Amino acid sequence: MIPNRSGRLACSGQLTCSGIRRVRILGLAALACWLPLLGCGRSGDRADRSGTGVTRLAVIPKGTSHEFWKSVHYGAVQAADEIGDVEIIWRGPVVESDTGSQIEVVKNMITRGVDGIILAPNQKGGLVDAVDEAITEGIPVVIFDSGLDEGPEIVSYVATDNYRGGQMAAEQMARAIGEKGEVILLRYLPGSESTEQREEGFLAGLSEYPEITVVSSDQYAGDNATSAKEKVDQLLQIHGDSLAGIFAVCEPNANGTLEALRNAGLTGQVKLIAFDPSDALIEALRDGDCSGIVLQDPVQMGYQSVKTMMAALNGEPTEPFVSTGEYVATPENMDEPRIRELLQPKLKD
């Protein structure tokens, strides 16, 4: 990781990172303080609180319903199998808006005395106290997918550069609509750091196109396709006749948006840019009903999170931020091997 001229972190790789222009875990200024604290005093020896010779890592996603998290799970188990004598304890709330349940999962893992916690916080502020409690109890924490408010001295942050992903969505939207027209930004949930970064990046990216107007950027679609469809139905009643495009910042939002556009007979006319794939969105991309999907690498997210945690537990140096890359699938490139792999990543049953 190297700083760019703006003081943000940048990635020197081509394939794994498309250029980190902005990283927000909100405690980024404190990153230099994290490395001396890695492993929480267990330098040189793998942790094993159970006394069985097996290192137990709790991997806690935002939710367990969407395919994205099943791919993260696959990557985490893949890393554990490679290392050996590592048990992945996969627990999380069913729905991504259930912060209370996620806090309870973290507290339960603290009580169980796991050797490390790997967490995707569904609220950047709501999980701070629980993470602090884990660290106080000597359990190191890796944050993945979505950032945490400043405070806890975590091991590392493993994620997509979501701000850059939002910019890439803006660039693809501009191409799809000929750099002019009215567009909608469909938000997710307040307090979700990853999607907030996508939203901010998208708006910043569109500022480069003076003939594109954002007619709605304050509507939250929620954490499921049904609520997203209902929200888009309402927006189409207001803006449908003149609308050129919609950016949906996550898989359930995009699925609901696609359904609403189809029901209104507006697919193809209103360009859809999605973030994260699903079977329905992949089919829509091939049929021309979706103009682009910003892709993450959830398998690598799970894999690198476990690898980073194990390095810390073994007293090895780790990076404060690990980028897992961001990409854009289009109708033109969707059959390229790397894009095809990211459109349909492997899942843990």
Please place each PLM-identified region on the residue numbering.
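Short, isolated positions within intrinsically disordered regulatory regions of eukaryotic proteins
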Residues: C11, R21, L35-L38, G44, ...
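A residue-level marker of the well-folded mature domains of exported/periplasmic proteins
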Residues: C40-D349
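Bacterial N-terminal signal peptides
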Residues: L26-L37
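Bacterial N-terminal signal peptides that target proteins for export
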Residues: I2-G27
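Short linear sequence elements within intrinsically disordered, low-complexity coil regions
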Residues: T16, R22-V23, L31, H73, ...
